[in-house]
Curated annotation (Swiss-Prot):
Belongs to the LDH/MDH superfamily. MDH type 3 family. This is Malate dehydrogenase. Substrate binds at R83, R89, N121, R152. The keyword Iron-sulfur does not apply. Catalyzes the reversible oxidation of malate to oxaloacetate. The lineage of its organism: Bacteria, Pseudomonadati, Pseudomonadota, Alphaproteobacteria, Hyphomicrobiales. Its EC number is 1.1.1.37. Keywords: NAD, Oxidoreductase, Tricarboxylic acid cycle. It is an enzyme of class 1 (oxidoreductase).
Amino acid sequence: MARNKIALIGAGQIGGTLAHLAGLKELGDIVLFDIAEGTPQGKALDLAESAPVDGFNAHLSGANDYSAIEGADVVIVTAGVPRKPGMSRDDLLGINLKVMESVGAGIKTYAKDAFVICITNPLDAMVWALQKASGLPPQKVVGMAGVLDSARFRYFLSDEFKVSVEDVTAFVLGGHGDDMVPLLRYSTVAGIPLPDLVKIGWTTQEKLDAIVKRTRGGGGEIVNLLKTGSAFYAPAASAIAMAESYLKDKRRVLPVAAQLNGEYGVDKLYVGVPVVIGANGVEKVVEITLDDAEKELFKKSVASVQGLVEACKTINPAFA
């Protein structure tokens, strides 16, 4: 039986980490693609030479031509530029929109049956543009944000309660930005909802509010510490969890940026919600009940995403 094929578009920090994790988990053969000549080839060779030590079997290759991704089962997109000091939102949108056009065209030509995971920021707008540019069915194109944001939320909660991260469940709704909505009511420690843990004196509402605030700024906190880039270990691990659920038909319930078609009162926008990921991509959108306060926060988050999408349409009317 042929191995699965995983194409990684962008061979930067996240791309290299994705390749390493995919190899360690033996998810399939791996192609690293980048426009920078030598970079994907060098990283692929370096990782291939680690296989005998780590004991994994996967063929790794690097390429500068989209034909190398032909027949990929999964495509993970990290290509694009990060926001730099002095760069406006529209500057970033304009540059990365062009990248999504080119990546989308490559996927359309060579990997039209793939499950596509977008990591490029601003995430919710870029995954929307990538789906448009690739022409793939919306259930086969998703954005990686909620898994990462939820992981950060879970880590901060486990640190607060001094318990294993395995016993903390939490998820985040909405866009991947300052308006994301970490849901305290639906987050638990060993099955006990956070509001109940406040009642029994394990923590305070003030501490939970501080954790929510830190979760919203989680990416920025790492950027400020690194000074030369942004997070890559946790984003890569998050995307691999999504890819693995698809490839192995695990049907995990994961928060991802998925296209909504009326769910949560949202139409034709990519927004972070819990979904079931299986062999068909997004198998189901899980629509949970929100209270009035949560609805308002979610609505604000959706409005931010809508603003980014409208800006994309203004920059390039072909996306309208």
